[in-house]
Amino acid sequence: MQPGGQPDMSALLAQAQQVQQQLMEAQEALANAEVHGQAGGGLVQVTMKGSGEVVGVSIDPKVVDPSDVETLQDLIVGAIADAAKQVTILAHDKLGPLAGGMGGLGLPGM
């Protein structure tokens, strides 16, 4: 703080640049991370990148029944939803602490 209670703008700028760099690094790490979702007790598994891209699907042959395709479809949707939930948790874990760091800049409303 400068005299008169005003924040030191150069220090604020340096801190903002540091937080921005950390945020970019965390976003890159998140995009490159992989999470796994599953349904049916692991009979259907999905691998998803942190960006949301599905990069793999594994289906146990036990759930492949030509007369009951609907169940398999439901399991695939469930596994994708589980993987998406894992991405959300990962994003919160990686990016959440950085959002908290913005409050320390000494700016009103942050």
From Swiss-Prot:
Localization terms from the record: Cytoplasm, Nucleoid
GO CC annotations, alphabetized: bacterial nucleoid; cytosol
Taxonomic superkingdom: Bacteria
Record Gene3D superfamilies: Nucleoid-associated protein YbaB-like domain (3.30.1310.10)
Primary localization class, coarse: cytoplasm
Keyword Kinase among record annotations: no
Keywords from the UniProt entry: Cytoplasm, DNA-binding
InterPro entries associated with the record: YbaB-like_sf, YbaB/EbfC
Molecular function (Gene Ontology), one example: DNA binding
Subunit architecture: Homodimer.
NCBIfam families reported for this sequence: DNA_YbaB_EbfC (TIGR00103)
Family: Belongs to the YbaB/EbfC family.
Function, as annotated: Binds to DNA and alters its conformation. May be involved in regulation of gene expression, nucleoid organization and DNA protection.
Name the record gives this protein: Nucleoid-associated protein Mflv_1287
Source organism of this protein record: Mycolicibacterium gilvum (strain PYR-GCK) (Mycobacterium gilvum (strain PYR-GCK))
